[in-house]
């Protein structure tokens, strides 16, 4: 299993505020409503065991879930296992959200005396793996996929969920053709108790963390921070590498604080515009999640067009094609914000 020490940009980190005492627990973590009714089953070891109509098979690659077979139908599921004591916290985000085409939810939940078993539909890889294996995603395909990602985030924000740890790896494919995405792992989300989305817990993945989370301020607004992370995801899809890279965390975080990145050559003007609308250093200047869906790049044919140099300003300098997702370097960058 990867760790923060390995500098994996997809692995979460936790950063405490550097000044002032920590306030009381964030309101989003307070109990709201009861979770859905659970089926009670005996406690048992999770591997190679029968569990109601399911049989649990080997662990999945990440070691946090298991393949499961629904015996009556032969359908394969993913089973996530949690301590039974965490049932309320795990299920609360799912009970808050109405069903949505691009947000995963448990097909069935079984509660034992010690363990909670949540069964999700089988997936076929995730966006991080797709970009890592293929590099840049062509604009038409990227727009098709990103529209689904933005719709999932907008649905969560509209119903009082802040994701905090948004990244490509959390968007998984539900079909073999890899054309339909759902957002998973909502159990990590903050459930807001009102319109205020102010958060104090600074938790994110290094490559996706917003500049406001790296500041010395004790709190930050959760929804714009999610939008920044979604902007990082979009840039990575279109460029094949992260917008902010550094061989050490201090270098990476310095670039994020400055908002320094360079868009790749060959992108259409609407695509470039959308990336810049999401990766704004000031949270209040970013698009809201619902506004992303109204952007021209997601409304029509996003085929790349040749850009005239007259359309390129200092904020539009480009880097050569071919950089991989794991490649790092300092060349070709320009600070987008003063």
Predicted feature descriptions by range:
Residues 127-137:
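AlphaC helix of the protein kinase catalytic domain
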Residues 157-174:
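Catalytic-loop of the protein kinase fold
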Residues 105-114:
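Short beta-strand micro-motifs within the conserved protein kinase catalytic domain, predominantly
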Residues 305-338:
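Regulatory extensions appended to serine/threonine kinase catalytic cores
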Residues 280-285, 291-305:
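Terminal C-lobe "cap" of eukaryotic-type protein kinase domains
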Residues 145-146:
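Activation segment signature within eukaryotic-like protein kinase domains
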């Amino acid at each position: 299993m990867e760790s923060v020490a390995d500098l994996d940009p997809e692995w979460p980190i936790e950063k405490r505020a550097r000044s002032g005492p920590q306030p009381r627990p964030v309101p989003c973590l307070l109990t709201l409503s009861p979770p859905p009714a659970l089926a009670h089953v005996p406690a048992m070891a999770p591997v190679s065991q029968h569990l109601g109509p399911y049989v649990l098979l080997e662990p999945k690659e990440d070691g946090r879930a298991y393949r499961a077979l629904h015996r009556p139908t032969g359908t394969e599921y993913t089973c996530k296992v949690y301590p039974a004591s965490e049932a309320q916290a795990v299920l609360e985000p799912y009970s808050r959200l109405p069903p949505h085409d691009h947000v995963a939810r448990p097909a069935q939940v079984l509660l034992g005396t010690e363990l909670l078993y949540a069964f999700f539909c089988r997936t076929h890889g995730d966006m991080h793996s797709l970009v890592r294996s293929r590099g840049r995603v062509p604009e038409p395909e990227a727009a098709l996929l990103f529209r689904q990602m933005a719709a999932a985030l907008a649905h969560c924000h509209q119903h009082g969920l802040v994701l905090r740890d948004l990244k490509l790896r959390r968007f998984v494919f539900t079909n073999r053709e890899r054309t339909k995405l759902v957002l998973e792992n909502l159990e990590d989300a903050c459930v807001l108790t009102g319109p205020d989305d102010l958060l104090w817990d600074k938790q994110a993945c290094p490559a996706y963390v917003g500049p406001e989370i790296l500041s010395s301020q004790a709190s930050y607004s959760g929804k714009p921070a999610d939008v920044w992370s979604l902007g990082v995801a979009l840039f990575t899809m279109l460029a094949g590498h992260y917008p902010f890279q550094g061989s050490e965390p201090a270098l990476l975080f310095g670039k994020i604080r400055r908002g320094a990145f360079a868009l790749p050559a060959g992108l259409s003007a609407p695509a470039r515009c959308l990336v810049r609308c999401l990766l704004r250093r000031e949270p209040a200047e970013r698009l809201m999640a619902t506004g992303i869906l109204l952007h021209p790049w997601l409304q029509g044919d996003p085929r790349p067009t040749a850009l005239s140099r007259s359309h390129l300003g200092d904020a539009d300098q480009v880097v050569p094609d071919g950089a991989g997702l794991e490649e790092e370097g300092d060349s070709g960058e320009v600070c987008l914000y003063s």
